[in-house]
């Protein structure tokens, strides 16, 4: 097995810089398909948080069994975002064109999911944090240094806010990443990984130890800075950008997909032995970046993976919409079917194991159905209609041209 980096002359033909005006590289079906697999732990973690099992041992076992795999998936999505956007950036693109595509990729789905969440909250009689909901509408909630401020409405949209911050910076970041000499790309990747590792260290050293979070043995500000702060998460996106350039410049090591996947497992297991904040992304980010690049190379070289099959790609295409609807369905759906005590407070309903599992499966199926509707009824039409400016009609020719 070859483990030395490619020299530029060894780069696969499909990865050579394209002619001006051409899309830079082939579609990466495997990176679309893996989105769905990465989303499953997020769904299951949020389902575990609902505590639907009446057997406390089973309920806590479910939550403990999920460990930090949901956090790892979120880190993967940030790395993936930086990689794919860099990979697909067109030579003829401008910052305005890029921002326009991102705007109509994110906000139509977000606004529909926001309204859907508000309707569910009203139906469930859930309390509104007005300032939190306004910040969430504009995807600004992750800038507020308090996880409890983020924990309202459709809580998962904090990551969209981090994405939007990265998109705003992307043209500048891309210009900087493109200036890195190919021979130095791996050094820069290593330096960025050190930054990701330094973030929890900085949080634990500089930020106050209280008020404390209910999990992890850390304070709210420490948790926010490491996990939610958009600029902290942007570092993972930039790692994805650098790995895309490593592949495109022919500096990739010949790491098979299976080996990269094994490293992800090893990285995850290793992370569980470390303090809470280091589990979130500091340890998993390296194997996740390696897996992303190895899948991209497999697709670009025509080897592909099962993740690039039609069904997996279809599921991956639904993943963004699924991500936006699943948490309100789990959280407020649970409230809707739970009783209230004499004081009007919700008493979360629990079930035996078969009924609880059935409920989770139903929530998954409903989320998938709504994701399909949103993807086909909102996301795709919005992208077709508004993601690119309409071409101006050609000016009419001279009056006698038609007759000629």
State where each predicted segment sits:
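Aromatic-enriched alpha-helical transmembrane segments of multi-pass intramembrane proteins
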Residues: 29-32, 70, 135-154, 158, ...
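Functional transmembrane helices that form membrane-embedded active or gating regions
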Residues: 23-40, 99, 106-107, 160, ...
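Hydrophobic transmembrane alpha-helices
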Residues: 83-90, 170-178, 240-248, 289-301, ...
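Alpha-helical transmembrane segments of multi-pass membrane proteins
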Residues: 42-53, 200-201
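Central hydrophobic cores of alpha-helical transmembrane segments in multi-pass inner-membrane proteins
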Residues: 76-84
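C-terminal "closing" transmembrane helix and its immediate cytosolic amphipathic cap
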Residues: 1-22, 312, 327-404
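Hydrophobic alpha-helical membrane-insertion segments
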Residues: 41, 109-122, 188-200, 281, ...
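Transmembrane alpha-helical segments and their boundary/interface "anchor" motifs
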Residues: 31-35, 69-75, 87-121, 131-135, ...
